[in-house]
């Protein structure tokens, strides 16, 4: 953990109720709790607060780990790593699923948007002016090995609702080669548009933070380098983050 001192090392587990399978319509995900936490503002001392608490879930008929991950603001990587013996598509009814909804904040002093690449998780720090900071955290999907998301600093340079995807030449060549798709752009609102409904433009050329049309890809390396969030998470984050907000892509193991 890079020599970090951890505040609040006690592991807390909460048993959560099992909602009916019918609640996993798209509306259920947009109604889930927002993972936000108030902490003392980081001061660069090396202290890394823990936010959240581990939860336990009992599987019901029809559940998948993908649905549970999305419902509890986890990525595919997080829920599968926490439950290696459970079939992610057909978990046994009554099985105990560990929901790793507790996170060590990246070290040390950050402001704005921070994406920890190895963790596949975004943190948005909002200082409150009273010595505290509200931290919002969401799982993300990242670039594939051949399109790896780089480390670096940036600022939010723009925000777009229903963005058109102007397909870069390199990606278009891949689409032509793999599936004979010759489109040069996909308009906003089209179900084939991988940007989803919201997009943050960055000062880091060629990279963006946006939604997705494939929610199960959150917690996987499936993009061409951009950062993907669940549709409901980007919808919550979008109005909170103003243009000009600083950000970083970092590599810190946890």
PLM segments and residue spans:
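N-terminal targeting pre-sequences for secretion and organelle import
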Residues: 235-254
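Sec/Tat signal peptide C-region and signal peptidase I cleavage site
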Residues: 18-22
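LysM (lysin motif) carbohydrate-binding repeats in extracellular/periplasmic proteins that recognize
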Residues: 60-90, 131-134
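N-terminal post-signal-peptidase region of extra-cytosolic proteins
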Residues: 54, 77-85, 96-111, 136-143, ...
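Bacterial N-terminal signal peptides
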Residues: 6-15
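Gly/Pro-biased beta-strand-loop elements
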Residues: 106-213
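Primarily a LysM-type cell-wall glycan-binding module
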Residues: 29-73
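Loop/turn positions that initiate beta-strands
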Residues: 62, 92-97, 244-247
């Amino acid at each position: 953990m890079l020599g970090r001192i951890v505040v609040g090392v006690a592991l807390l587990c909460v048993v959560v109720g099992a909602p009916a399978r019918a609640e996993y319509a798209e509306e259920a995900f947009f109604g889930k709790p927002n993972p936000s936490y108030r902490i003392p503002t980081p001061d660069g001392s090396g202290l890394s607060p823990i936010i959240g608490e581990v939860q336990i879930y009992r599987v019901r008929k029809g559940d998948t780990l993908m649905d549970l991950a999305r419902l509890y603001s986890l990525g595919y990587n997080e829920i599968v790593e926490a439950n290696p013996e459970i079939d992610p598509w057909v978990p046994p009814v009554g099985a105990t699923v560990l929901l790793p909804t507790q996170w060590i904040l990246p070290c040390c002093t950050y402001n704005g948007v921070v994406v920890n690449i190895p963790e596949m998780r975004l943190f948005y720090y909002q200082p409150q002016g009273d010595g505290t900071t509200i931290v919002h955290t969401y799982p993300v999907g990242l670039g594939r090995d051949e399109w790896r998301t780089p480390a670096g600093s940036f600022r939010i340079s723009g925000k777009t609702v229903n963005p058109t995807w102007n397909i870069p030449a390199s990606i278009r060549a891949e689409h032509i080669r793999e599936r004979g798709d010759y489109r040069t752009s996909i308009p906003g609102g089209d179900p084939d548009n991988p940007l989803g409904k919201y997009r943050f433009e960055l000062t880091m050329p060629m990279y963006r933070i946006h939604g997705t049309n494939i929610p199960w890809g959150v917690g996987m390396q499936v993009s061409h380098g951009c950062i993907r969030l669940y549709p409901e998470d980007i919808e919550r984050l979008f109005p909170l983050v103003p243009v000009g907000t600083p950000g970083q892509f970092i590599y810190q193991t946890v």
